[in-house]
């Protein structure tokens, strides 16, 4: 999909006049008319150079030959020029590092007037760096035995970050096992005698306790350590042991650390600052030459603050080609700590509704905790935009920052101007966010004025994030997303690259549905509405487009997250044509209250868990979701059923990573940054889609299938030198049908090549699978590509010794004493949820008399479901689906052990059950009949047998019954293979 020129241009349908006007205004952010008009008008740029540059002079003309010496003077002159309102104003920054002693603040006085733009940009060929850090020099050995060096950096300041050779270094820390300590309402008691030395440490109030939990990553500073008692600072400890995923009751096994003591400095790459003495300690990494190290010690918490007031916002400002770097964020080291809740939000201050026994009574939520939600704070960004309009960041880099890279329209607490929200028509294009403590971009606030503003000018609207790269960031505040937007009206997140993140890739929405009209039943039960209104109007969150993004390797550290994550109602919003690969958990995650979203034509490859999941528990209103035409390598989807809760779920396709359809290949190729921002060719995302199909997909021994390779050019350029080859395993034959493609493919064109694939005449196993591989070589531009695809052909030896029946599509095979059933089926079971008798069976007709034993070994099971079943069966007539009585099975499952099931009322359905957990294939199973009674047994070795459950009486049992092998995949429409051996009836 090509990027739309504006956040919400739609290819089909009519647009209202008001909407058209809004789109045209937003489009101006991308058109960048300022530079062109300035040239035409002959307006001279204001040129500035870093401090100490030769010929730089604040009293000079501010030209390339005699640039200004300070950014302050450049800003003063830009303000004066902008105030005239006659032309665009450009400030050019020459190459070098501009070390700030205080943040740059841009307000209404810095704004472009009369439709003109004020641009702060890199001079041609320059890479200017705005830094809040100072370089560290003068290293000397501190401890030769441990390889620790030190440098004097000046006393009287603190920092939580050090950047070495362009990467954040790790503060000195030790790991603390959960068994080393006992958590208490005031801190913890040391249980491990090896930690007794903690009581002797100096500067104890500067020591941090970190708890890495499920979806929260928490920090609290120490107050004191005496003997084995550690007392933590307040309210940090109270707030971190309050609510959900709390330190004392995490949702998964926690990891604890103590940080920031000289004594902890024992690993290469760690550092410690003695702020009183002004001494920095560092232990170099292997191979790191301390004399060549580039170390930057940050002193500022923010670099650029763009914002005016709602009456006089900052306007018409553009920042282009700049690098923002070298900040810290000190708040987590205060007595507040970082009582993290989710995605950069944290509890701040003393909580008046916290009960005295909250350490136990509120460790997994309580009514008092609900009172905190409306006052949660947000992490402050290094670059901040609020109360501002027509602001653009283009081709810029945000790196080595102590918190979030760029905050747009966050709450007032996260803006140094003291005015939050109110960000309109802000665009971030072609920029890079990496190697920082916090997430990349955060749009919107989380407090009441963010979702139900008391002043309409507070609404965040018309935000565009496009062609950016956000990767390997949130290195300290692991709970933060690469891109996160809470409450915003008209937001486009298009064609960004997101990768290597600890938590979610792209997160949209906040509030868990509690602030939507009518509220949330779950939060009614929790008591939230005793502390806030139950709103009857929608929030400001609507009209969001998440389109064409490439998201990979996310959810690498934390949990309860996905490639794309949503919360609450987001009317008129779409998630389309994104490519998600290698998520550590989910693909699409529709969390509490997610509504009114559609997700179409996305590709999910290698998600560790479901490709899509909706949290619709506890009465929340999650629903009204549309999922159409998506592709996934993991078939699992939960909480989303077509026709339930207003959901539409159809035409989604499970694909093989080695054989993706051409349409999926196009989506993969087009995902991520576009045009000049696309970057180097990616061999994993080639401009040619190649897919293999087989007709039929399964053959008999000696049979043939037609395999077709379809090659489609999904790019806008020509593919040349196309060549296709196919290989098959030994014993199989491949014969080309027709002539090969000898020409290239124009943009959008496709071609096919076909082969006849023939299986060997017989096999030594019931089922043989052959990997048919196609290799396609071609060139596009100056780059050569090879695309490999494969599919599996299944060939079955004929079933000759037994009969077969399938109540659902099934195939059967045998070789020697081994058998295979390939079948699907919802289940073989009847209860209140429904009556199911869907299976495949091979059997001997009327083989079991009144005294009979049926035995077999289940050798193999596809894990189509934990309750898939394979084993032995007795039934009057195994072809009498849903009607024949005398029905009993003894089966093995992939995830629930073995089960003896029987028809207790003679209606033709299994309805009674006994089981033993922990048993998997291979395992032996047996049914023993004596008159009208049947018993089930299992064995792990074929000699020692264990009875399962009671002996069952089967009403309507016949004198002679069919006996055989039965299987069901317990997954409607999903075929599994089930193997058997040593079948016998006696």
Model-identified regions with their sequence ranges:
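Right-handed parallel beta-helix
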Residues: 315-326, 365-370, 389-400, 420-438, ...
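Extracellular glycan-recognition regions
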Residues: 792-986
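Short glycine/acidic-rich loop motifs that flank beta-strands on beta-rich extracellular proteins
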Residues: 102-103, 301, 328-334, 380, ...
């Amino acid at each position: 999909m090509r990027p739309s020129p504006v956040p919400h241009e739609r290819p089909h349908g009519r647009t209202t006049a008001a909407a058209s006007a809004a789109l045209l205004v937003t489009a101006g952010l991308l058109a960048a008319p300022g530079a062109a008009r300035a040239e035409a008008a002959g307006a001279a740029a204001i040129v500035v150079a870093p401090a100490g540059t030769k010929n730089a002079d604040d009293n000079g003309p501010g030209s390339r030959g005699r640039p200004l010496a300070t950014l302050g003077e450049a800003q003063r002159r830009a303000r004066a020029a902008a105030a005239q309102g006659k032309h665009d104003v450009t400030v050019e920054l020459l190459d070098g590092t501009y070390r700030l002693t205080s943040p740059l603040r841009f307000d209404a006085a810095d704004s472009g007037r009369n439709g003109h733009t004020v641009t702060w940009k890199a001079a041609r060929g320059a890479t200017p760096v705005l830094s809040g850090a100072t370089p560290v020099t003068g290293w000397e050995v501190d401890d030769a035995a441990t390889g620790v060096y030190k440098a004097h950096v000046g006393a009287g300041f603190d920092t939580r970050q050090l950047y070495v050779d362009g990467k954040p270094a790790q503060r000195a820390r030790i790991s603390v096992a959960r068994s080393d300590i006992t958590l208490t309402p005031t801190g913890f008691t040391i249980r491990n005698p090896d930690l007794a030395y903690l009581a002797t440490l100096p500067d104890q109030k500067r020591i941090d306790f970190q708890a890495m939990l499920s979806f929260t990553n928490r920090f609290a500073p120490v107050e004191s350590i005496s003997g084995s008692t550690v007392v933590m600072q307040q309210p940090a400890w109270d707030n971190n042991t309050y609510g959900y995923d709390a330190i004392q009751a995490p949702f998964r096994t926690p990891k604890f650390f103590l940080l920031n003591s000289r004594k902890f400095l024992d690993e290469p790459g760690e550092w410690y600052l003695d702020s009183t003495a002004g001494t920095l300690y560092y232990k170099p990494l292997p191979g790191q030459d301390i004399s060549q190290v580039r170390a930057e010690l940050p002193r500022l918490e923010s670099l650029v603050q763009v914002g005016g007031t709602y009456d006089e916002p900052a306007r018409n400002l553009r920042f282009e080609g700049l690098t923002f770097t070298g900040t810290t964020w000190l708040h987590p080291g205060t007595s507040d700590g970082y009582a993290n809740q989710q995605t950069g939000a944290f509890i701040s201050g003393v909580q008046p509704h916290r009960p005295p026994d909250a350490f136990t009574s509120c460790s997994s939520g309580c009514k008092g905790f609900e009172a905190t939600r409306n006052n949660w704070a947000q992490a402050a960004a290094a670059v901040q935009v609020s109360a501002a309009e027509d602001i653009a960041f283009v081709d810029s880099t945000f790196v080595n920052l102590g918190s979030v890279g760029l905050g747009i329209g966050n709450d007032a607490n996260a803006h140094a101007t003291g005015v939050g929200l109110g960000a309109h028509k802000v665009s971030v294009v072609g920029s890079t966010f990496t190697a920082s403590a916090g997430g990349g971009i955060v749009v919107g606030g989380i407090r009441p004025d963010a979702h139900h503003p008391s002043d309409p000018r507070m609404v965040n609207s018309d935000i565009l994030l496009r062609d950016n790269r956000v990767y390997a960031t949130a290195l300290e505040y692991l709970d933060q997303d690469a891109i996160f937007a809470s409450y915003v009206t008209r937001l486009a997140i298009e064609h960004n690259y997101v990768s290597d993140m600890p938590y979610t890739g792209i997160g949209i929405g906040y509030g868990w549905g509690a602030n939507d009209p009518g509220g949330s039943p779950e939060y009614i039960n929790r008591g939230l509405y005793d502390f806030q209104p139950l709103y009857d109007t929608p929030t400001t969150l609507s009209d969001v487009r998440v389109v064409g993004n490439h998201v990979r390797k996310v959810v690498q550290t934390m949990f309860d997250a996905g490639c794309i994550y949503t919360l609450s109602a987001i009317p008129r919003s779409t998630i389309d044509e994104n490519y998600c690969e290698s998520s550590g958990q989910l693909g699409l995650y529709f969390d509490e209250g997610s509504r009114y979203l559609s997700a179409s034509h996305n590709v999910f490859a290698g998600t560790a868990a479901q490709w899509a999941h909706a949290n619709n528990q506890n009465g929340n209103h999650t629903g009204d979701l549309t999922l159409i035409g998506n592709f996934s390598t993991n078939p699992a989807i939960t909480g989303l059923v077509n026709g339930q809760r207003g959901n539409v779920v159809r035409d989604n396709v499970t694909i093989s990573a080695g054989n993706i359809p051409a349409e999926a290949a196009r989506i993969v190729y087009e995902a991520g940054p576009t045009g000049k921002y696309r970057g180097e060719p990616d061999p994993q995302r080639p401009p040619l889609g190649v897919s293999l199909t087989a007709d039929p997909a399964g053959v008999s021994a000696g049979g043939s299938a037609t395999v077709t390779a379809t090659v489609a050019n999904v790019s806008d350029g020509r593919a040349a030198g196309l060549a296709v080859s196919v290989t098959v395993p030994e014993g199989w034959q491949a014969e080309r049908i027709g002539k090969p493609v000898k020409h290239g493919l124009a943009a959008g064109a496709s071609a096919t090549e076909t082969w006849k694939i023939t299986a060997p005449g017989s096999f030594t196993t019931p089922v043989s699978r052959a990997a048919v591989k196609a290799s396609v070589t071609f060139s596009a531009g100056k780059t050569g590509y090879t695309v490999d695809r494969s599919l599996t052909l299944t060939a079955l030896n004929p079933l000759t010794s037994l009969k077969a029946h399938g109540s659902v599509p099934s195939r059967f095979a045998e070789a020697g004493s081994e058998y295979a059933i390939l079948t699907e089926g919802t289940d073989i079971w009847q209860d209140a949820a429904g009556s199911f008798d869907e299976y495949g069976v091979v059997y001997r007709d009327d083989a079991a008399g009144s005294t009979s034993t049926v035995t077999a070994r289940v050798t193999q099971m596809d894990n189509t479901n934990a309750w898939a079943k394979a084993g032995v069966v007795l039934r009057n007539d195994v072809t009498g689906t849903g009607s024949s009585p005398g029905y009993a099975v003894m089966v093995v499952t992939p995830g629930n052990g073995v089960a003896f099931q029987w028809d207790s009322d003679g209606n033709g359905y299994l309805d009674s059950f006994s089981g033993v957990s922990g048993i998997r294939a291979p395992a032996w199973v047996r049914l023993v009949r004596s008159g009208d009674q049947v018993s089930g047994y299992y064995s792990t070795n074929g000699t020692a047998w264990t009875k399962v459950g009671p002996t069952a009486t089967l009403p309507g049992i016949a004198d002679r019954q069919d006996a055989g092998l039965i299987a069901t995949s317990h997954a409607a429409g999903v075929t599994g293979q089930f193997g058997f051996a040593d079948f016998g009836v006696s």
